[in-house]
UniProtKB/Swiss-Prot annotation:
Gene3D superfamilies: 3.30.465.10, UDP-N-acetylenolpyruvoylglucosamine reductase, C-terminal domain, Uridine Diphospho-n-acetylenolpyruvylglucosamine Reductase, domain 2. It comes from Carboxydothermus hydrogenoformans (strain ATCC BAA-161 / DSM 6008 / Z-2901). The gene is murB. The lineage of its organism: Bacteria, Bacillati, Bacillota, Clostridia, Thermoanaerobacterales. This is UDP-N-acetylenolpyruvoylglucosamine reductase. The active site is at R176, S226 (proton donor), E296. InterPro entries: FAD-bd_PCMH, FAD-bd_PCMH-like_sf, FAD-bd_PCMH_sub1, FAD-bd_PCMH_sub2, MurB, MurB_C, MurB_C_sf, Oxid_FAD_bind_N. Its cofactor is FAD. Pathway: Cell wall biogenesis; peptidoglycan biosynthesis.
Length: 302
């Protein structure tokens, strides 16, 4: 399908603009990445369903992203359609304390809503800059808690645009992974299992976890969080530091002096700069410890 026809068909299915040759650096927390042929932001689960079904039926390459907080987009960008869930962002908290959130809701915003009604459980996850959908897909975690620990149910859309429901124990959660990483299912909504708590205590914990994050992570620079998964029994940052990779630079990219498992964009970094540092870190850690560091961030595009 040619680009003009594809744009026309996308425009029929969503109520927001279809952005053409959209720089993905504007849609990732690393502020890195070339253009997508098209970027769209469906306004509802129904629009997302129509789009996914259409793209699948017409064999159009596409990718669904949330807040872009765990992604490295390569410098030539993405051929196809990027679907951003930012506007699929309703939160519902029932009188009985059930908490429902759509895929595009950011975790800090969800934690703030839970705090308002005195529900506890999201405090450890409150500073993760990801969306509900992205966090569930990769089983995001912080301070010893993972999102699976507070999840009750997940709803997804499959390639045919059909809604499916999974209980948390059916999601195949592992360290920084779930079945949704492998399967053609896209998370659209989740129900969380939270407990009533004292608002002052919840707020105190939220502040503590935010302060810890500020103290230990280089948040003054664009970044994508932890670049590598932790090998069993030892944090990746420790291996990186001891292998002598902390402080390495390439172009505008640098291995953070504050947290060795972060690569920061000090200004004008390219994806090629980041890839160079990733390879260098893996090489140095392997040479010193015979440990292969695996990526936590996902690489997208060409």
């Amino acid at each position: 399908m040619d680009k003009a026809k594809l744009k026309e068909e996308l425009t029929k299915r969503i109520s927001s603009p279809v952005l053409e040759n959209e720089p993905l650096a504007q849609h990732t927390t690393w502020k890195i990445g070339g253009p997508a042929d098209f970027l769209i932001e469906p306004q509802s689960i129904e629009e997302l369903s129509l789009v996914i079904r259409f793209l699948t039926e017409n064999a159009v390459n596409f990718r669904v992203i949330g807040n872009g907080s765990n992604i490295l987009v390569l410098d030539r960008g993405f051929r196809g359609v990027i679907i951003k869930t930012k506007k699929i962002n309703k939160v519902e908290i029932t009188a009985g304390g059930q908490v429902f959130a759509e895929a595009g809701v950011l975790l800090p915003a969800l934690a703030a809503r839970a705090l308002k009604v005195g529900l506890s459980g999201l405090e450890e996850l409150c500073a993760i800059p990801g969306s509900v959908g992205g966090a569930i897909r990769q089983n995001a975690g912080a301070h010893g808690k993972e999102i699976k620990d507070v999840l009750k149910r997940v709803w997804t859309i499959n390639e045919r645009g059909e809604l499916k429901e999974f209980f948390a124990n059916e999601c195949g959660f592992k360290y920084r992974s779930s079945r949704f990483k492998e399967e053609k299912q896209w998370i659209v909504k989740a129900e969380f299992s939270l407990n009533p708590g004292d608002k002052k205590e919840i707020l105190k914990k939220i502040r503590e976890f935010r302060e810890k994050r500020l103290a230990s992570q280089p948040l003054e620079f664009p970044n994508a969080g932890s670049v590598f998964k932790n090998p069993e029994g030892i944090p990746a940052w420790k291996l990186i530091k001891e292998a002598g990779a902390q402080g390495l630079k390439k172009g505008g990219a640098m291995v953070s002096e504050k947290h060795a498992n972060f690569i920061i964009n000090t200004g004008g970094a390219s994806a090629a700069d980041v890839i160079y540092l990733i390879n260098k870190i893996q090489e140095l850690v392997w040479k010193k410890f015979s440990v292969k560091l695996l990526l936590e961030v996902e690489v997208l595009g060409e």
